[in-house]
Amino acid sequence: MTEKINLFDYTPKALADWFVAQGEQPFRAKQVLKWLYHERVYDFERMTDLSKKLRAMLSEKACVILPQVIADKTARDGTRKWVFQYACTNSIEAVFIPEDDRGTLCISSQAGCALACPFCSTARAGFNRNLTTGEIVVQVWLAKELVHCERNGNSRLITNVVLMGMGEPLINFNQVLPATEIFMSDWGFGLSKRRVTLSTSGVVPAIHKLREVTDLSLAVSLHAPNDELRNKIVPINQRYGLKALIEACALYAENNKQHGGITWEYVMLKGVNDTLEHAQQLADLLRNVPGKINLIPFNEFPNSPFQCSSWEDIVRFQQFLQKAGYIATIRKTRGDDIDAACGQLVGRVNDRIRRERQFQGFKA
């Protein structure tokens, strides 16, 4: 028997092609996707504008795979974290951050992460595998459902999606790209390009490839203003150095001017990357690339070799960048009391690749 397809894996075009292969009209895809994404209905028998024959065919050949919600926590500040478990027993985490004028959902692209950045708790958990397109998309679908049920039916509360959870999205390019297409499709979640952000640690070839097919918002986990330091705290820099990264981002920003350019993420680590000398190096490095700098207070976790910079040092760093002509903001820490803040997402990663030595021997 042929394995059933998971509808969450399919973009509108891919699903239309699938219907044609079944001897059906391509417009059936939009009918089904409207039920799935707009009405949040995945029981084919409830798709009342489909014929009985078509519903029977869908029941035989297609399905919707939902993960199990094994944890649902709400922080003091209203941030909400879910742990989703897939059939393979790996679990990943997604975080909803409500604000007065928006609701941001942070989702994962991999079970774990192989990049071994020593300031990130996710990296310590190791890496198992890439998530499928459907496993990425369903995080948004299920989060909308869970928020909808508790917020008087207001499904518009999730206004932004950021691929900043577990994993490096651009290593999982072939699964992430269709997911972003579904996020932005009118027959999917209908988000605008400026409301979908992909965060990368700097997979340079994939940034070039991404530029050729989309112009969604791009964030770069920079964290250091020179190669010597970045080689230590963002190890992928040993493969793709700052010169190549900045050049790739400058080209991407040319396609992305209407979205404000690149968002540069910079975690503030006490005594490591937080001096005014580092700020000057950062200002020089980013001089010709439009964008903004987001300073992130480090969120500590057990046995971490790092501490967060003092608030005074973070503000001093910000003010230096602002005087140098940059838009520089300090990210407000959200959800740290439930381990939902930046760098704290772990989930459960089975058959993982351990990275302990990366943490034990760090020296700034």
From Swiss-Prot:
A GO CC term assigned to this protein in UniProt: cytoplasm
Cofactor remark from the record: Binds 1 [4Fe-4S] cluster. The cluster is coordinated with 3 cysteines and an exchangeable S-adenosyl-L-methionine.
Subcellular location: Cytoplasm
A GO biological-process term: rRNA base methylation
Keyword Secreted: no
Residues reported to bind S-adenosyl-L-methionine: G167, E168, S199, S221, L222, H223, N299
Cofactor: [4Fe-4S] cluster
Binding locations of [4Fe-4S] cluster: C113, C117, C120
Residues covered by the Radical SAM core domain: 99-337
InterPro entries the UniProt entry points to: Aldolase_TIM, Methyltransferase_A, RlmN_N, RNA_MTrfase_RlmN, rRNA_lsu_MTrfase_RlmN/Cfr, rSAM
This protein's UniProt keywords: 4Fe-4S, Cytoplasm, Disulfide bond, Iron, Iron-sulfur, Metal-binding, Methyltransferase, rRNA processing, S-adenosyl-L-methionine, Transferase, tRNA processing
Active site: E93, C342
Cysteines joined through disulfide linkages: C106-C342
Reactions that this protein is recorded to catalyse: adenosine(2503) in 23S rRNA + 2 reduced [2Fe-2S]-[ferredoxin] + 2 S-adenosyl-L-methionine = 2-methyladenosine(2503) in 23S rRNA + 5'-deoxyadenosine + L-methionine + 2 oxidized [2Fe-2S]-[ferredoxin] + S-adenosyl-L-homocysteine; adenosine(37) in tRNA + 2 reduced [2Fe-2S]-[ferredoxin] + 2 S-adenosyl-L-methionine = 2-methyladenosine(37) in tRNA + 5'-deoxyadenosine + L-methionine + 2 oxidized [2Fe-2S]-[ferredoxin] + S-adenosyl-L-homocysteine
EC id: 2.1.1.192
GO molecular function: 4 iron, 4 sulfur cluster binding; metal ion binding; rRNA (adenine(2503)-C2-)-methyltransferase activity; rRNA binding; tRNA (adenine(37)-C2)-methyltransferase activity; tRNA binding
Top-level taxon in the UniProt lineage: Bacteria
Protein family per UniProt: Belongs to the radical SAM superfamily. RlmN family.
Entry function: Specifically methylates position 2 of adenine 2503 in 23S rRNA and position 2 of adenine 37 in tRNAs. m2A2503 modification seems to play a crucial role in the proofreading step occurring at the peptidyl transferase center and thus would serve to optimize ribosomal fidelity.
General remark: Reaction proceeds by a ping-pong mechanism involving intermediate methylation of a conserved cysteine residue.
Protein name as it appears in the record: Dual-specificity RNA methyltransferase RlmN
Source organism per UniProt: Dichelobacter nodosus (strain VCS1703A)
